[in-house]
Amino acid sequence: MLLQFRTGTNSDIPQLQELAIKSWGEYEKVLLPDYWIKLFSNISNPDTYSELLEIAHCEVCTNEENTIVGMAFLVPSGNATEIYEASWCQLRFVSVDPSYNGQGIAKTLTQKCISLAKQQNEQIMALHTSEMMDKARHIYESLGFTILKEIPPRFNKKYWLYTLTI
């Protein structure tokens, strides 16, 4: 199976939406219906991706048919939110098509974002993840991310803020 990595663009938005729905669909089983509806409306909204693409680098993984099977966004420092400091870059929306799980795609996407952050002289990379994202937490911890603190629950689930000194 030939997998390739490239920069994602606005023309990829329909595939990014489709991938997110596939990837995040597993959480429908563990979220209360109201929370799933809220999450689904975010991941299925094209504006979610167009707004990220305005400020962030998008790294995608494609299969031999050029279908996007993985994505991650690197938001540069200077984009503070209620949980991210302005001096941090952010790793966002790491997602993999479930039929491609276990092939190292999420880890490679994360490593590519770390490498790009180093090239851009970022100092700290941050991300948030939850108790329902065991596989993701394992990948992040294996790459050196550590829990900075627990943040207020989202979707009635525990969430943590992780950081990595670059």
Model-identified regions with their sequence ranges:
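Conserved GNAT-fold acetyl-CoA-binding loop/helix
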Residues: 4, 21-48
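A short helix-loop-beta-strand connector motif used in the catalytic cores of GNAT acetyltransferases and
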Residues: 45-60, 90
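A conserved beta-turn-beta hairpin within the catalytic core of GNAT-like acetyltransferases
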Residues: 78-91, 101, 156
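Residue-level recognition of the GNAT/N-acetyltransferase active site
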Residues: 92, 97, 101, 130
